[in-house]
Amino acid sequence: MNQDWLFQTETSICQLRTAGVLVRDGKVLVQRDGVEYALPGGHVKIGETTVEGLVREYKEETGADVKVGRLLWTEECIWTWNGKLAHDLAFYYQIELCHSGDLPDTGEFIPQKDNGRIVLGWLPREQETIPNFV
């Protein structure tokens, strides 16, 4: 289980991603890379399930242990990224922290554990950004 479920050619990229929706006190945890926001998660490795990948990715990125709940939605997205045709499949799960103190809400964005360029922070949950079923 060492290789990411990620396939590339000179002109294309295809990947399987898993991410978690963590809501606490009316806020959702997001990651920010420059001006782009996403839900924390990452590539699934070949031979692991999307749930196993999410638990592993959350630990790598945040240092927190999570319990994975129900699958909220799936996404298939095709677009051009860095001049390549990108085809992503993603699974989004409801999650909760095993230990509530693992990710404090200081009002500041903090660097991710495995990539300091990407920061984590809590944003207010608003009707326009988070579906009702979350």
Where are these regions (language model features)?
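Acidic, metal-coordinating catalytic segment for phosphate/diphosphate chemistry
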Residues: M1-A19
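Short hydrophobic/aromatic beta-strand or adjacent loop that forms the aromatic wall/cage
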Residues: Q15-A19, D88-Y92, R117
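Conserved Nudix-box catalytic region and its N-terminal flanking loop in Nudix hydrolases
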Residues: V23-A64
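Active-site-adjacent beta-strand/loop module that shapes the phosphate/pyrophosphate-binding cleft
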Residues: W79-T106
